[in-house]
Amino acid sequence: MTVLDDHFPQGDDETVVPTSSSIPILSQMRQIVIKKRLLISFLLTFFILALSSASILTYFFFRSKSITNFKSLAIEHIESHYPSMDPSKRAGFVEEIVKIRQTGKITSDAESELDMLIEFDAFVEKYKKVHRSFDQRVQRFLTFRKNYHIVKTHKPTEPYSLDLNKFSDLSDEEFKALYPVITPPKTYTSLSKHLEFKKMSHKNPIYISKLKKAKGIEEIKDLSLITGENLNWARTDAVSPIKDQGDHCGSCWAFSSIASVESLYRLYKNKSYFLSEQELVNCDKSSMGCAGGLPITALEYIHSKGVSFESEVPYTGIVSPCKPSIKNKVFIDSISILKGNDVVNKSLVISPTVVGIAVTKELKLYSGGIFTGKCGGELNHAVLLVGEGVDHETGMRYWIIKNSWGEDWGENGFLRLQRTKKGLDKCGILTFGLNPILYSS
């Protein structure tokens, strides 16, 4: 028999259970670990905040230094380049350009930015621009600044020039809103009907006399062979003075239509009328006043209701209640509508002709020469075609256009537009041609 001692363990080892005296030690260790973690988190957060604060302080330090340098350069520039300017005005310009610089919307080139601001201020005074707030003035300056760069970077080798004008503070969106799409007429005059109009004109001695001047010739052997090439109605008194529709009313449709009727009476009746565009803006319900319209509906209005004189319904550029003159009215007898090459070979021969062109933001800055720049994709501006010519140095042919943007735009209010002889030609100028007609000589 084997005797087993009862103090020897049998089977698996026994699990050691912590005594009550070891629990406080573990709790203390956990607290120490937590405190260390909190301390590390605090130190890390403090470090990040300190680094961020240092970065912010550094940014503002250098920004402040940059603004200070900008101001110093501006003061130096204005004192050396504008010595005759009133000191208080010089200080005002410096303060304003520094304030604009602080917005971050202009460059650090104090000299050029200051020059632009001074030119902008002269522009504001010249065109009587009004700004309701500093923010609005800044926004207009930034737009002016953009057009300023376009003008200054325009290549002198181009056959046309650009310059700042009353449109220079209009954004592209604002300018586009003034010139909505012009829909071409849906029906056109038959060539047989147009031939009747042409034969009537041949019976008018006033017309024949002015046609010779427009063509630059002393004798016309065969009237049927006369075309619009080298014909310029502006050589005669058949073109009424340039007018200005303003920079806040899209009324080119009314101005071009009135211009054509004024020319018609000068050319066939030898009467110098000044007629009312404002009546068309107010009363032609087929159009939208200052929001755009169609020359064809304007001429239809004059045909059916007549139009008042400018002195009785003067132009304001604001849509007002329709109150035309009751007594004094000028009428037309009919309307001719042609397209394509018939516009130059037939329409223009009868009289200055209403056409549509697709203008762009560049054309608004045109100041002279033969415009060969980009055109828009759709007709959006109605003008009066008064002639066709050629530059004898380059051989480039061009259209002569009477615009409604005032005498201080383009070539005393006129535009020479490149003639390409391709399709509907430059800017779609041959898409349609409208002529008012008088039957009686």
UniProtKB/Swiss-Prot annotation:
GO terms for molecular function: cysteine-type peptidase activity. The keyword Acetylation does not apply. Keywords: Disulfide bond, Glycoprotein, Hydrolase, Protease, Signal, Thiol protease, Zymogen. Disulfide bonds join C249-C290. InterPro entries: Papain-like_cys_pep_sf, Pept_asp_AS, Pept_his_AS, Peptidase_C1A, Peptidase_C1A_C, Peptidase_C1A_papain-like, Prot_inhib_I29. The active site is at C252, H381, N403. Glycans are attached at N270, N345. Its EC number is 3.4.22.-. GO terms for biological process: proteolysis. It comes from the Eukaryota. The keyword Cell division does not apply. Belongs to the peptidase C1 family. This is Cysteine proteinase. The gene is TACP.
